[in-house]
């Protein structure tokens, strides 16, 4: 069986190749030559129609597997070009893409192909949004100081209403949404899970000496992976704690930028130095060397 693995590669030089590698994985690289609107692409998501949406430093791109279509926010009040410097995205169940940019937040309706600017009713307006998570009617925004801002979305007034919640304005190391729409926040001393009704549960932070820069929570298997300083820590989630299972060391890998699940035991690891496939059952990994001249980091979309 063949698999398509699209790696969103952030390039400072352009180089393109499509090839087959071990285990029949086909790697496809999208660059300016295929119509990407900017060589710096930061984030990638998939909608329920199968389209891939790529956020770049010059607008939004839709990839259908063959062609790329570009979208640029030209709405009145959008501070160009900073509003089109897309830093992160998330998509809601109704097909709305929520976009965090270098100049605030806006949405894009994939059904009508229209942008809508949103105003946050606090001091976060017109500031860079580094991380964005949608949780039903709520939105989590991470600012440049790694602090979280929680809002309720008012679609009629195109506003974000601040929510008084314990997570607000607290510094974090990373934040993650699991497959049940629970949001996991990692700080220096604890891990907080926030459920869709905004109730919370706290866990003691695992004894990891370094900052945790990336996590994956798999609620179907109660497994948790934490990435810190080029190491991946394997845990099982029990009722009140994380139980340590194992650790994988990726030699000379300073930053792990993304983790995606493929099967119960197989995970794709995106790093500054290339792409790895990790099997947590036997704690082995394979390196997939991608033919890119200068590579900064990976975001992964595996199907």
What would you call each of these model-derived segments?
Residues 1-303:
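Carboxylate-rich, polar loop motifs that coordinate divalent cations or form catalytic acidic clusters
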């Amino acid at each position: 069986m063949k698999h398509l693995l699209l790696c969103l590669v952030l390039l400072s030089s352009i180089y393109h190749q499509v090839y087959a590698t071990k285990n029949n994985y086909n790697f496809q690289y999208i660059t300016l030559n295929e119509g990407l609107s900017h060589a710096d692409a930061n984030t990638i998501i998939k909608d329920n129609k199968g389209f891939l949406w790529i956020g770049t430093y010059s607008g939004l791109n839709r990839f259908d597997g063959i062609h790329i279509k570009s979208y640029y926010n030209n709405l009145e009040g959008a501070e160009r070009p900073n509003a089109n410097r897309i830093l992160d995205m998330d998509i809601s169940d109704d097909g709305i893409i929520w976009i965090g940019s270098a100049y605030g937040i806006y949405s894009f309706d994939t059904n009508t192909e229209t942008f809508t600017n949103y105003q946050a009713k606090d001091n976060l307006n017109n500031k860079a949004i580094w991380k964005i998570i949608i949780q039903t009617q709520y939105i989590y925004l991470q600012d440049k100081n790694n602090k979280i801002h929680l809002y309720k979305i008012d679609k009629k007034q195109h506003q974000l209403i601040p929510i008084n919640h314990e997570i607000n304005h607290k510094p974090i190391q990373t934040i993650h949404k699991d497959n049940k729409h629970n949001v996991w926040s990692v700080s220096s001393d604890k891990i907080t899970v926030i459920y869709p009704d905004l109730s919370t549960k706290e866990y003691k932070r695992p004894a990891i000496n370094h900052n945790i820069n990336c996590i994956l929570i798999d609620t179907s298997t109660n497994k948790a992976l934490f990435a810190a300083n080029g190491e991946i820590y394997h845990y099982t989630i029990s009722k009140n704690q994380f139980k340590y299972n194992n650790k994988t060391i990726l030699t000379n890998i300073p930053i792990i930028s993304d983790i995606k699940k493929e099967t119960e035991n197989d995970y794709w690891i995106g790093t500054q130095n290339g792409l790895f496939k990790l099997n947590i059952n036997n704690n082995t990994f394979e390196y997939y060397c991608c033919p890119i001249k200068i590579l900064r980091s990976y975001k992964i979309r595996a199907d």
